[in-house]
């Protein structure tokens, strides 16, 4: 039998393993996250001026995604909680002066829910408004303590019909609907967002299903969780990003919705006495 040599790992390998262990621990504790980018915007991702962080990673593959470069968690920039909170503190005075705050978007921020929760906790500790921009697909991952630190949810409802939702995202509709109901029962304020894509999400029965769902949310909790519905017209501004990541863009030849179509869809929501933008 040949001799078996039990060699001690080299110092370099040991150091690498220690660093990897420390990194994984930091991720689990929410001390380290993967960030795609950040920006200061006004009246887009919530009220007032917002410091919006786009976290990397998403479980959906929406056909109309304008940020496909956020899909992969490893592609983001490793960012410490301290780096994020330092920037928040730097802009806090401006954000407060405009009645704005901090928004976490993506990607899907709930894929990094521990990191996101730590950020929201810091915001609340210094009196800043918080908003979560999410599909709601991973809503079951977060507990009530997480939601206690969220002042507004921008809930992206991609479709009202399961088959259309599956076609658009590659996933199931039910988790999003359940998360919306949970928010409504808690009384968490919501802006419902709906991306209108001709020949994909514009069918009358699909819009009716979304509108019925949103109306049903108003019968839960305090009856006033949904503050507005935003109809977002499809656009082609994300085309270059699809090309940059080497993915064929399935909606390359799709045109934005006409004014007539936009008004028809807005009218379907207004018919249920919902505030529509």
List PLM regions with ranges:
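Non-heme iron-sulfur electron-transfer modules
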Residues: 24-31, 71-89
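Solvent-exposed alpha-helices and their adjacent loops that cap or buttress functional pockets
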Residues: 27-28, 44-47, 96, 146-147
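Short, conserved loop/turn and helix-capping segments at secondary-structure boundaries
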Residues: 78, 170-173, 256-259
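Conserved AdoMet/S-adenosylmethionine-binding subsite of the radical SAM
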Residues: 85, 89-101, 105-106, 110-243
């Amino acid at each position: 039998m040949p001799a078996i040599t039990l060699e001690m790992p080299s110092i370099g390998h040991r150091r690498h393993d220690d660093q990897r262990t420390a990194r994984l621990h930091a991720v689990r504790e929410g001390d380290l996250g993967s960030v795609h980018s950040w920006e200061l915007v006004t009246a887009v991702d919530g009220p007032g001026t917002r410091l919006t962080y786009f976290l990397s990673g998403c479980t959906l593959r929406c056909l109309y995604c304008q940020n496909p470069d956020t899909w992969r968690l490893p592609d983001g920039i490793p960012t410490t909680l301290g780096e994020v909170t330092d920037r928040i503190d730097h802009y806090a005075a401006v954000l407060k002066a405009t009645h704005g705050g901090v928004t976490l978007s993506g990607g899907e921020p709930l894929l990094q829910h521990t990191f996101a929760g730590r950020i929201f906790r810091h915001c609340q500790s210094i009196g800043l408004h918080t908003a979560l921009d999410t599909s709601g697909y991973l809503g079951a991952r977060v507990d009530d303590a997480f939601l206690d630190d969220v002042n507004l949810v921008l809930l992206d409802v991609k479709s009202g019909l399961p088959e259309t939702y599956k076609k658009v995202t590659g996933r199931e509709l039910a988790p999003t609907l359940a998360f919306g109901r949970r928010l409504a029962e808690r009384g968490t304020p919501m802006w419902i967002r709906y991306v209108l894509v001709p020949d994909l999400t514009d069918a009358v029965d699909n819009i009716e299903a979304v509108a019925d769902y949103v109306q049903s949310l108003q019968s839960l909790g305090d009856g006033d969780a949904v503050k507005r519905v935003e109809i977002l017209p499809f656009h082609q501004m994300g085309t270059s990003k699809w090309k940059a990541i080497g993915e064929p863009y399935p909606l390359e030849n799709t045109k934005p919705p006409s004014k007539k179509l936009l008004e028809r869809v807005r009218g379907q929501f207004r018919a249920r006495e919902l505030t529509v933008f």
